[in-house]
């Protein structure tokens, strides 16, 4: 394995870590509606536990309301029940075969709670990135120990991985601040 491969590998893993963090942030409810918030809702479909997106069409009506259109009319009650029983704190209402899911306004206390959750998730992502940095540096040290690279090459590799880590952590911080601003906006 070369230094370039170590750096490329670390970069790919760090990008995956940031992508996972973005997905985690999407699941955190803010005052605004977005279809992704219902991704974690599963519905009993003839004995199978399926994600909501596989049994219904989920769209936005406006900034605070999600529309769920079941593909089978008989599923409307099961979908409504699954949304209500999820830990999202949502109260869907059924209008025939269309289910409307209004997003309740967040209380100040809940907003502060959610910002703590966002910060904690951000810290967890940073720890994951730092662990990837450590792994990459350990690989470079092993190459040095096996005399496959010089000390200068090892030092250069450590510096490049550190710059990459700093850039990724800055991206995570930017995402955290953006989500906090979104949560705290009334």
UniProtKB/Swiss-Prot annotation:
Chief location of this protein within or outside the cell: cytoplasm
Entry-linked CDD domains: RRF
Protein's UniProt keywords contain Cytoplasm: yes
InterPro entries: Ribosome_recyc_fac, Ribosome_recyc_fac_dom, RRF_sf
Subcellular location: Cytoplasm
GO cellular component terms listed in the entry, alphabetical order: cytosol
SUPFAM superfamilies with a match to the protein in the record: Ribosome recycling factor, RRF
GO molecular function, a single term: ribosomal large subunit binding
BP GO terms, sorted: cytoplasmic translational termination
UniProt keyword list: Cytoplasm, Protein biosynthesis
Family per record: Belongs to the RRF family.
PANTHER family named in the record: MITOCHONDRIAL RIBOSOME RECYCLING FACTOR PSEUDO 1, RIBOSOME RECYCLING FACTOR
Reported function: Responsible for the release of ribosomes from messenger RNA at the termination of protein biosynthesis. May increase the efficiency of translation by recycling ribosomes from one round of translation to another.
Entry protein name: Ribosome-recycling factor
Species this chain originates from: Leptothrix cholodnii (strain ATCC 51168 / LMG 8142 / SP-6) (Leptothrix discophora (strain SP-6))
Taxonomic lineage from the root: Bacteria, Pseudomonadati, Pseudomonadota, Betaproteobacteria, Burkholderiales
């Amino acid at each position: 394995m070369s230094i370039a491969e170590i750096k490329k590998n670390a970069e790919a893993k760090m990008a995956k870590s940031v992508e996972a963090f973005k997905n985690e942030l999407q699941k955190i409810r803010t005052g605004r509606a977005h279809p992704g918030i219902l991704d974690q809702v599963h519905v009993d479909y003839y004995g199978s536990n399926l994600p909501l997106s596989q049994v219904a069409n989920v769209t936005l009506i406006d900034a605070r309301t999600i529309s769920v259109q079941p593909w089978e009319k008989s599923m409307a009650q099961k979908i409504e029940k699954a949304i209500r029983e999820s830990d999202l704190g949502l109260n869907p209402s059924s209008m025939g075969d269309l289910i409307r899911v209004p997003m309740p306004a967040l209380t100040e206390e809940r907003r502060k709670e959610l910002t703590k959750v966002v910060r904690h998730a951000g810290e967890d992502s940073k720890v994951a990135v730092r662990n990837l940095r450590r792994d990459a540096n350990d690989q470079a040290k092993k190459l040095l120990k096996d005399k496959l690279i010089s000390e200068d090459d090892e030092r250069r590799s450590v510096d490049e991985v550190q710059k990459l880590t700093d850039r990724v952590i800055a991206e995570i911080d930017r995402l955290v601040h953006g989500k906090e601003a979104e949560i705290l906006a009334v």
